[in-house]
């Protein structure tokens, strides 16, 4: 089964048409939507979301996933650290969260995708909340199932669940939940191994690809996939063997030359995933 390549148009800016045109030029037929027109996708009004879908349809592109910010939040009483939430608040009242879940499911429907990303609460010391025991999660999973959507948990280091053991714990506790596996994040927490990938593969429904070179000051220099420290040449074949046919989404974070990074990343993926990518 051949895997697919996914491109996020907002890597090239807030006019989604620009990124979609690059996708076409690269032979990429699937999109991930996170932000557009200066707003998080969940904050866009229905007409703006429909416009994104129309632009994709006009080019023969399909939205593979909605990269929502659900659960990348904490309570208003907590103080989050520096977090990139892509235009969405990091402090959300408990009473508002159900509405955001419903909005994400609605946006996914408007975009025509069945995959919606979620996180696991920001880590904020003693005020950190638990996703595994969050009563909102069973509600969200049932609402998603009714809508024909699957919620996929990303392993995010600034959130509570980033390592294989904790990922497996919550995925097994909530069978409707899938995994949005970020291999760069897995490497960041010291778990970028073939063994970890093989353990997580049965739950994986979507894959994020980004690469970087660690700096002496603890920061990262993001680079095109295949040119950094993440051991993709070992991880990608192992994941494909265990779980063929997955979507692989390029998330470069390369600010200066995003088009070049996406082009090189797409070439690398096609050369490294056995059988190539569509």
Where are these regions (language model features)?
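Short beta-strand segments at enzyme active-site cores
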Residues: 32-33, 64-68, 113-120, 151-154, ...
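Flexible loop residues that form catalytic
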Residues: 36, 71, 121, 212, ...
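Glycine-rich, proline-tolerant flexible connector loops at the mouths of alpha/beta enzymes
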Residues: 33-56, 121-124
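Flexible, glycine- and charge-enriched loops at secondary-structure boundaries
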Residues: 42-49, 87-94, 126-133, 193, ...
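Histidine-acidic metal/acid-base catalytic patches
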Residues: 1-8, 12-29, 50-53, 57-60, ...
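Active-site acidic/histidine proton-transfer and metal-coordination neighborhood
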Residues: 13-17, 21-22, 58, 73-178
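Glycine-/proline-rich flexible loop or hinge segments
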Residues: 34-38, 85-87, 251
């Amino acid at each position: 089964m051949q895997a697919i390549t996914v491109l996020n148009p907002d890597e090239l800016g807030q006019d989604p048409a620009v990124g979609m045109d690059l996708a076409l030029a690269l032979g990429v037929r699937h999109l991930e939507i996170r932000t557009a027109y200066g707003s998080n996708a969940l904050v866009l009004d229905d007409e703006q979301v429909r416009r994104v879908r129309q632009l994709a349809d006009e080019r023969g592109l399909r939205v593979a996933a909605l990269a929502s910010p659900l659960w990348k939040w904490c309570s208003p009483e907590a103080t989050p650290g520096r977090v990139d939430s892509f235009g969405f608040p990091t402090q959300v009242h408990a009473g508002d969260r159900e509405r955001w879940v419903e909005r994400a499911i609605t946006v996914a429907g408007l975009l025509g995708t069945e995959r919606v990303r979620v996180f696991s609460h920001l880590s904020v010391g003693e005020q950190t909340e638990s996703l595994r025991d969050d009563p909102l999660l069973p509600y969200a999973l049932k609402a998603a199932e009714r809508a024909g959507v699957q919620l996929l948990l990303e392993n995010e280091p600034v959130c509570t669940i980033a390592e294989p053991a904790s990922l497996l714990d919550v995925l097994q506790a909530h069978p409707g939940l899938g995994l949005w596996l970020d291999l760069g994040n897995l490497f960041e927490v010291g778990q970028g191994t073939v063994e970890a990938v093989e353990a997580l593969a049965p739950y994986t429904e979507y894959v994020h690809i980004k690469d970087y070179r660690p700096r002496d000051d603890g920061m990262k220099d993001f680079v095109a996939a295949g040119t950094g420290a993440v051991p993709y040449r070992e991880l990608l074949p192992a994941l494909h063997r265990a779980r063929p046919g997955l979507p692989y989404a390029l998330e470069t974070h390369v600010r200066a030359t995003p088009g070049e990074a996406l082009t090189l990343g797409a070439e690398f993926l096609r050369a490294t995933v056995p059988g190539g990518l569509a």
